[in-house]
Amino acid sequence: MLLKSTTRHIHIYTAEVENNELIPSESVLTLDVDPDNELVWSEDALQRVYAKFDELVETYSGEDLTDYNLRRIGSDLEHYVRSLLQKGIVGYNLSSRVRNFSMGLPQVIASESK
């Protein structure tokens, strides 16, 4: 049975992707980060999210994969994305089709004047 956790910027499925289709799996989790491209990501920022995902999944190692546990992982990962945004590691994509500042208003960092 396909379980999923979806937040604004994090989608997790108990499935594998084959030919752009989700195939339910009891042993594989698939992570989709920011499917609507609301944020601007560097490769480093994405790798941080993947590493945090691996860390969170490891904390549930040995436990049953339940809807509740999957939602906890998704929620914790969404909070992690918010922390990356607040630190300026990722930013809002102002060219996105949707402008939803669900994690706070964009910040403009003033450059130092000489």
Curated annotation (Swiss-Prot):
Pfam family, one: NdhM
Keyword Translocase found: yes
Job description of the protein: NDH-1 shuttles electrons from an unknown electron donor, via FMN and iron-sulfur (Fe-S) centers, to quinones in the respiratory and/or the photosynthetic chain. The immediate electron acceptor for the enzyme in this species is believed to be plastoquinone. Couples the redox reaction to proton translocation, and thus conserves the redox energy in a proton gradient. Cyanobacterial NDH-1 also plays a role in inorganic carbon-concentration.
Family: Belongs to the complex I NdhM subunit family.
Keywords of the record: Membrane, NAD, NADP, Plastoquinone, Quinone, Thylakoid, Translocase, Transport
Membrane topology value: Peripheral membrane protein
Protein name as catalogued: NAD(P)H-quinone oxidoreductase subunit M
Subunit structure: NDH-1 can be composed of about 15 different subunits; different subcomplexes with different compositions have been identified which probably have different functions.
Enzyme Commission numbers on file: 7.1.1.-
Top-level taxon: Bacteria
Claim: Transferase is one of the keywords in the record: no
MF terms in GO: oxidoreductase activity, acting on NAD(P)H, quinone or similar compound as acceptor; quinone binding
InterPro entries: NdhM
Organism expressing this protein natively: Acaryochloris marina (strain MBIC 11017)
Disulfide bonds: none
Protein localization: Cellular thylakoid membrane
GO (cellular component) term, any one: plasma membrane-derived thylakoid membrane
PANTHER family documented for this protein: NAD(P)H-QUINONE OXIDOREDUCTASE SUBUNIT M, CHLOROPLASTIC
Annotated catalysed reactions: a plastoquinone + NADH + (n+1) H(+)(in) = a plastoquinol + NAD(+) + n H(+)(out); a plastoquinone + NADPH + (n+1) H(+)(in) = a plastoquinol + NADP(+) + n H(+)(out)
